[in-house]
Design a protein with these regions (language model features):
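Conserved glycine-rich cofactor-binding loop
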Residues: 14-15
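Conserved glycine-rich Rossmann-like NAD(P)H-binding loop of the short-chain dehydrogenase/reductase
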Residues: 30-45
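The beta1-alpha1 cofactor-binding region of Rossmann-like NAD(H)/NADP(H)-dependent oxidoreductases
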Residues: 60-71, 103
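Substrate-binding pocket helix/loop in short-chain dehydrogenase/reductase
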Residues: 97-98, 102-107
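Active-site helix of classical SDR
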Residues: 121, 157
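Residue(s) in the substrate-gating loop at a strand-loop-helix junction
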Residues: 141
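C-terminal helical subdomain
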Residues: 181, 197-232
Length: 257
């Protein structure tokens, strides 16, 4: 994918991987429309890039609000005539404890991590289908590969997202629309800064953004990283559950030391 002058719409753009992706995409010469709830932060990012001559657009919205997401997409299309790459990055995690189990925690996570992406795809798809061109990408997580302690909500939302994108790829590619699923491991962001447990293969956010942009440029259908850690987890997906369970419990004990 040629990212120079590419019309990119990215959600979750105010911090973490999203903000780093804005920087990386601008360096590629892309035109970047940024969506997040914090309009003031988006304006600060936009001012910095506009000062260097980049073309950036601020379209604040809460991705859990379907009407707001559609409104943001219409604003980008009105400004630039369309979206070439829709990059859905917004998401959040919460570790759930069975001693305080609440199904609403699942609903809140899914509203952002799954439906927030589906609202965005729903919003941009008609124009992409008309043009028979475009690309959809979303940031899932290696946590979506298999179950892990306290990740019932976050992990299942990312598993749902991976499955949805892998399925949509079959449906959209005949219409000229590409689909990429992005599955990062641990990345140093404001979200992971709150974690107190062991995070193997923790990656710098700018390096993560560079890996994602390189993968998009090369037209990858899946972008997973860090390489050694992600390939290890891919192999673990193939293990019988009793063996997988023993390995996970051992890793948890190691991280608790």
């Amino acid at each position: 994918m040629d990212l120079h002058s590419c019309r990119v719409w990215i959600t979750g753009a105010s911090s973490g991987i999203g903000a780093a992706l804005v920087d990386a995409l601008v360096k590629e010469g892309a035109r970047v429309a940024m969506t997040a709830r914090r309009a003031d932060t988006l304006e600060e990012i936009a001012a910095r890039h506009r000062a260097s001559g980049a073309e950036v657009l601020v379209v604040p919205a809460d991705v859990a609000d379907r009407a707001a997401v559609h409104g943001a997409a219409r604003a980008v299309e009105a400004a630039w005539g369309g979206v070439d790459l829709a990059l859905f990055n917004a998401g959040f995690g919460r570790r759930l404890q069975v001693t305080n189990f609440n199904a609403e925690d699942f609903a809140e996570i899914f509203r952002v991590n799954v439906f927030g992406v589906m609202y965005g795809i729903e919003a941009v798809l008609p124009r992409m289908l008309e043009r028979r061109a475009g690309h959809v990408a979303a940031v899932a997580s290696l946590a979506g590969y298999r179950g892990a302690p306290t990740l019932a909500g976050y992990g299942s939302s990312k598993a749902a997202l991976i499955h949805a994108l892998d399925s949509l790829r079959f449906d959209l590619e005949p219409h000229g629309i590409g689909v990429t699923v992005i599955t990062p491991g641990y990345v140093r962001t404001p979200m992971t800064a709150q974690h107190t447990y062991w995070m193997p293969a923790l990656m710098d956010v700018d390096k993560a953004a560079a890996v994602i942009v390189r993968g998009l440029r090369r037209g990858r259908k899946e972008i997973h990283f860090p390489a050694r850690f992600s390939w290890t987890l891919k192999v673990l997906r193939l293990l019988p559950f009793p063996l997988y369970e023993r390995l996970v419990r051992a890793a948890v004990k190691r991280g608790a030391r």
